[in-house]
Swiss-Prot record:
The active site is located at the dimer interface. It is found in: Cytoplasm. It comes from Xanthomonas axonopodis pv. citri (strain 306). This is 4-hydroxythreonine-4-phosphate dehydrogenase. SUPFAM superfamilies: Isocitrate/Isopropylmalate dehydrogenase-like. Catalyzes the NAD(P)-dependent oxidation of 4-(phosphooxy)-L-threonine (HTP) into 2-amino-3-oxo-4-(phosphooxy)butyric acid which spontaneously decarboxylates to form 3-amino-2-oxopropyl phosphate (AHAP). Binds 1 divalent metal cation per subunit. Can use ions such as Zn(2+), Mg(2+) or Co(2+).
Length: 323
């Protein structure tokens, strides 16, 4: 069986992404053929900062020795200074993501692994950008769901990067139905669960307390869950968020759907931040990202933890092999 070819996109060049890619290249792997979509000078600078070897190869050349890294070059406008993002390089960051996505959509690649990006630097460079998840969804022309996962729990989000005051208005029947259908399909296809058990959190404290603490559960969530149960989905909820993550309850769920970002993710990150990854469900190819930021204060110092990138790469390879 041929191993999948995956794009490795480091993200913000001034952050820890490039050095994490260099660290990843020190262990040639048998589960995937990785191709970095990055600036070669930045990768060489990262290798020098870490005192590690890197040998950049043609995209189709196999990585056989520590430091071998096939490269699809993405040229930056200015040289990288670790720890200091330059808005002039925003176009290169976006070009790396879009080029990798285009190659996936064309069938030349089977998945994407992404490092952390610096949203402020991209927007300061004159490019409107809210997140890589949204960018890839727009390019593929399909709705997606953001899921974060570690070895303990998988959490999918109905809403993502919204101000808290806007969340309640965004919890609609259509949004919830779409999120749950995408999550259910991904659990079946990507994780091999024929009948996934999906817990759904309520929006309000105590899941609305029978309407006394808000009516979203009664008016929106419960009718949506009943509709999907009629389609054969195994859904639990709506559950109060403050007790849904108890270990004895989590053992009965394959995934948890949270209504908003900070409802579901703090518990996940507390339970295993280093191994956590960000998965985009619903794309025609697997995309898995690290679950940490650019860590500018660590960039170029050789002390950044590669665990999340290693976990993201291993998971993306497994998901790609199932497609």
């Amino acid at each position: 069986m041929m191993v999948p070819s995956l794009a490795l996109v480091p993200g913000e060049p001034a952050g820890i992404g490039p050095e994490l890619c260099v660290r990843l290249a020190q262990q040639p792997r048998s589960d995937a053929h990785l191709i970095a979509y990055a600036d070669p000078d930045t990768l060489h600078s990262a290798a020098t900062a870490l005192s590690l070897p890197v040998r950049l190869l043609e995209p189709d050349q196999p990585a056989r020795a520590p430091g071998d890294l096939p490269l699809h070059p993405i040229r930056q406008a200015v040289a990288t200074r670790f720890g200091a993002p330059d808005p002039a390089n925003a176009a290169a960051v976006i070009a790396g993501l879009r080029s990798a996505a285009a190659d996936c959509l064309a069938g030349r690649l089977q998945g994407i692994v992404t490092g952390p990006v610096h949203k402020a630097a991209i927007n300061a460079g004159g490019i409107a950008y809210t997140g890589t998840t949204e960018l890839l969804a727009e390019q593929a022309g399909c709705p997606v769901v953001m899921m974060l996962a570690n070895s303990i729990v998988r959490v999918a989000l109905v809403t993502t990067h919204l101000p808290l005051r806007a969340v309640a208005d965004a919890i609609t029947a259509d949004a919830l139905l779409q999120c749950l259908r995408i999550t259910h399909a991904a659990m079946q296809r990507d994780f091999g669960l024929e009948h996934p058990r999906i817990a759904v959190l309520g929006l309000n404290p105590h899941a609305g307390e029978d309407g006394h603490l808000g009516r979203e559960e009664l008016d929106i969530v419960i009718p949506a869950l009943e509709q999907l149960r009629g389609e054969g989905m195994q859904l639990i909820g709506p559950l109060p968020a403050d007790t849904a993550f108890l270990p004895q309850k989590l053992r009965g769920f394959d995934a948890v759907v949270a209504m908003y970002h900070d409802q579901g993710l703090p518990v996940l990150k507390y339970s295993g931040f280093e191994q956590a990854v960000n998965i985009t469900l619903g794309l025609p190819y697997p995309r898995v990202a690290v679950d940490h930021g650019t860590a500018l204060e660590l960039a170029g110092r050789g002390i950044a933890d590669p665990s999340s990138l290693m976990a993201a790469t291993a998971l993306c390879a497994r998901l790609a092999a199932r497609r």
